[in-house]
Amino acid sequence: MSNTYAINEGVLTRLHREPAAPLAGEVTVEIQASSINYRDLGIQAGFYPSRGGVVPISDGAGRVIDIGDGVTDLVPGDLVASCFFPFWEAGPATAANHCASLGCEMDGLLRSTATLPASAFLRAPDYLSASEVATLPCAAVTAWAALLTR
């Protein structure tokens, strides 16, 4: 059973969900740490369009525990960091690569286990702790966007 938290009408609610087995192209990650950033606050404040009842938090880290068919970049045991725009892998921001983001249109990482597209995670160096890795995603994509898309 996975501990999962969702926000409904401003109230944080604990849910119990069975973790989904990964389908082709997906991975299951045991979430070991998550971090809150301004984006997460903005989602809850309504600055971004979000569906109701979404699992919040876009930045997190953990260990891969299972992979679906076709996943070649990650293996069980890998320490990974989340990518809150899992479909934005290169180039400028577009409607297609910003259509879904963790903690906004897709369930985020305030849960103990997450099954998501493999593109929602990147392998992280093992010399960092999960707590350290969880602080990097928003800062990293902000720096990447500033350097490479302007």
Where are the predicted features?
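Glycine-rich beta-strand-centered segment in the early N-terminal region that forms part
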Residues: 20-34, 44-89, 125-128
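Short Gly/Pro-enriched turn/cap motifs at secondary-structure boundaries
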Residues: 18-19, 51-58, 101-106, 112
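Residues that act as N-cap/strand-start positions at coil-to-secondary-structure junctions
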Residues: 13-14, 108
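NAD(P)H dinucleotide-binding glycine-rich loop of Rossmann-like/cofactor-binding domains
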Residues: 85-150
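Alpha-helix/helix-capping structural signal
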Residues: 34-36, 69, 119, 141
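Conserved hydrophobic/aromatic beta-strand scaffold that supports enzyme active sites
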Residues: 14, 19, 61-63, 113-115, ...
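Extracellular beta-rich ligand/substrate-recognition surface
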Residues: 4-12
